[in-house]
């Protein structure tokens, strides 16, 4: 992370010494039990999607907490792992909106400028939201603020009540916010189905002179 285009700008948004606190937290929790994603993938979203490449931000809450699922990109799992229910619903909405994506590994989105960011970057095995409120939210809020300050228009995709609270951090009128219910089976019928976030994002990117995302990759 230190050598990425993100580092200095995120650091400037945080209190002095906050990166050190994150390192201490990670050393502690990874030494005490099973934590997801693997330590080397905690910052995968920022390493795969460089700041100068960001076109879309899709905000999740925290990583998947089952074996082999989390890979440091919100909602994504490796193709060797069955797609969790929320991801199944995302891919169904994509199919209805644009077409069928055969892979449920979303790395190809990240490589095209889709920042797949979780608000909390680690989770204990089997404990959803187990690290919520401990260290990560100021860091990931800083990431959102760094993107908000870009002159280049960016699409923020906010699914569910938790992500929609982050709308307060997106104050730049150049950007587009797409919000709906969460793709979880518990809430998908409250406005996620038929929300067409993928075609809406691409329409905005084209309008602002940017290459659209190939969501089917």
UniProtKB/Swiss-Prot annotation:
One of its GO terms (cellular component) is cytoplasm. GO terms for biological process: base-excision repair, AP site formation via deaminated base removal. It catalyses: Hydrolyzes single-stranded DNA or mismatched double-stranded DNA and polynucleotides, releasing free uracil. GO terms for molecular function: uracil DNA N-glycosylase activity. InterPro entries: UDG_fam1, Ura-DNA_Glyclase_AS, Uracil-DNA_glycosylase-like, Uracil-DNA_glycosylase-like_sf. PROSITE patterns: U_DNA_GLYCOSYLASE (PS00130). The active site is at residue 62. The keyword Repressor does not apply. It is found in: Cytoplasm. Its EC number is 3.2.2.27. The keyword Cytoplasm applies. Keywords: Cytoplasm, DNA damage, DNA repair, Hydrolase. Belongs to the uracil-DNA glycosylase (UDG) superfamily. UNG family. Excises uracil residues from the DNA which can arise as a result of misincorporation of dUMP residues by DNA polymerase or due to deamination of cytosine. PANTHER family: URACIL-DNA GLYCOSYLASE (PTHR11264:SF0). NCBIfam families: PRK05254.1-1 (NF003588), PRK05254.1-2 (NF003589), PRK05254.1-4 (NF003591), PRK05254.1-5 (NF003592), ung (TIGR00628). HAMAP family: UDG. This is Uracil-DNA glycosylase. It comes from Streptococcus pneumoniae serotype 4 (strain ATCC BAA-334 / TIGR4). The gene is ung.
């Amino acid at each position: 992370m230190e050598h990425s285009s993100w580092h200095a700008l995120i650091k400037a948004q945080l209190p002095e010494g906050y990166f050190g606190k994150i390192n201490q937290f990670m050393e502690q929790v990874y030494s005490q039990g099973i934590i997801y994603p693997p330590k080397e993938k905690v910052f995968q979203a920022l390493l795969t999607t460089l700041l100068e490449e960001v076109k879309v931000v899709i905000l999740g809450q925290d990583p998947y907490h089952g074996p082999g699922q989390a890979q440091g990109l919100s909602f994504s799992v490796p193709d060797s792992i069955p797609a969790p229910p929320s991801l199944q619903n995302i891919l169904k909405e994509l199919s209805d909106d644009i077409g069928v994506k055969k892979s449920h590994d979303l790395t190809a989105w990240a490589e095209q400028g889709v920042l797949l960011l979780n608000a909390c970057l680690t989770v204990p095995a089997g404990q959803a939201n187990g690290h919520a409120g401990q260290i990560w939210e100021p860091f990931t809020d800083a990431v959102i603020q760094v993107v908000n300050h870009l002159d280049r228009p960016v699409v923020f995709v906010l699914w569910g009540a938790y992500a929609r609270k982050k709308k307060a951090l997106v104050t730049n009128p150049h950007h587009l916010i797409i919000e709906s219910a969460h793709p979880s089976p518990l809430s998908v019928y409250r406005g996620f189905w038929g929300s067409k976030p993928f075609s809406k994002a691409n329409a905005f990117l084209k309008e602002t002179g940017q290459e659209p995302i190939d969501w089917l990759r």
